[in-house]
C-alpha cells in the first residue's frame, strides 16, 4: 500500500538502500539504524521506494538514487510501498458468532456420566456369595452383568481379607470402598490394555493392604504348579531321565576314535581303518631344485647372491684366485686342475711342451 514518508533534514537519514534499474531490481530499504530519523519515521526493512522528492524511481540506477537522496538538504520525501502482512487466526463459530480461538490450560470439570462404559465411578459395596454376615446387599448392583446404577452408597461394616478375591472376580469393574479402623481403602480396578496386570497379583496386593490395616498376617497363596498325571508318557520320560546318570557328550569324531581304541586289532569293526596323526615333513627333504647351494670354496650354504662357474657355486666374496685371492668378478677366470685362478697364475701353471706357445682362448659370447 503506497504511502508518503517525510524525513526532516539534514542527513544522515539512517537507512541503507539496495537495487536499481542497473540491478534489475526495485529500490528497497534493506537496513534501518536504530534511533535514526528513518526509524523515527517508521520506515521498515523491505519497503519499496517508488519516488524520491517527487521523482519516480522506475528508471533510476542505484547511483542516481543515492545522488537524489544526497541532494535533499532540508527534508527527504519518500513514497514507499509496504506489503500488507496478515496474521492468520483461526475462527471458531459458536451459536452463529465468530470469535478468536480460545486456549484454556485449566482442566474443565467433566460429568460423571461422560465415560463410555456408563458405569458408576462412585464406589459401591459388594456382597460375597454364601456369606451373609456383616455384608449388606447394594440396591444398584446386577450380579449377572456386573453393572451398577446410581443409587445410595452403603459401606461394609466388617470384612474378611480372604473374601476379597471372590468379590472382585464377581464384579471386576466395580470399585470397592472399605472402612477400616483409622484407614479407608478404595480399590478401583479397571480393564487394562492387553491384560497388562494380572488379576491375581492385584488381589494379592489388596488382600495384603487390608490384612495389614486389620493387624493380621497376610496369608499369601502358594504358587500353583501344573500337575502331570503319573500315567502319562511325559511324566515317565521326565522321571526316567532324572534317575538315569547322564554321560558326558562327545562329538562324532571323538566317539569313533574311542571305539577304535577300545577295540583290539582282531575285532576291528568292518568299514573302519587305522587313523594316524599327520607327520610334518621337513622342508629340507624336498627335491634337488629346492636344496640350498653349497659354496665350492668354504663349504657353507649360500643365501642371497650366488656365483656359478662350471656347475659350481661360490659366494661372491669366495670367487677369488687360489694364489693371489684376487676377486674374479667382471674378470676372466681359469680352472687349472680343479682350482680357480686368474689369467696370470693360470699361465704360470700351464707350461706347454717345448716348441709350443700358449694361446688364451675366450668363450664365444
UniProtKB/Swiss-Prot annotation:
InterPro entries: PDLI1-4/Zasp-like_mid, PDZ, PDZ-LIM_domain, PDZ_sf, Zasp-like_motif, Znf_LIM. PROSITE patterns: LIM_DOMAIN_1, LIM_DOMAIN_2, PDZ. This is PDZ and LIM domain protein 3. Keywords: Cytoplasm, LIM domain, Metal-binding, Phosphoprotein, Zinc. Residues 293-352 form the LIM zinc-binding domain. The gene is PDLIM3. It is found in: Cytoplasm, Myofibril, Sarcomere, Z line. Gene3D superfamilies: 2.30.42.10, Cysteine Rich Protein. One of its GO terms (cellular component) is cytosol. Residues 147-156 have a biased composition (Polar residues). May play a role in the organization of actin filament arrays within muscle cells. It comes from Sus scrofa. The modification Phosphoserine is found at residue 18. CDD domains: LIM_ALP, PDZ_PDLIM-like. Residues 1-84 form the PDZ domain. One of its GO terms (biological process) is actin filament organization. Interacts with ACTN2. Forms a heterodimer with PDLIM4 (via LIM domain). Residues 126-156 are annotated as: Disordered. GO terms for molecular function: actin binding; metal ion binding; muscle alpha-actinin binding; structural constituent of muscle.
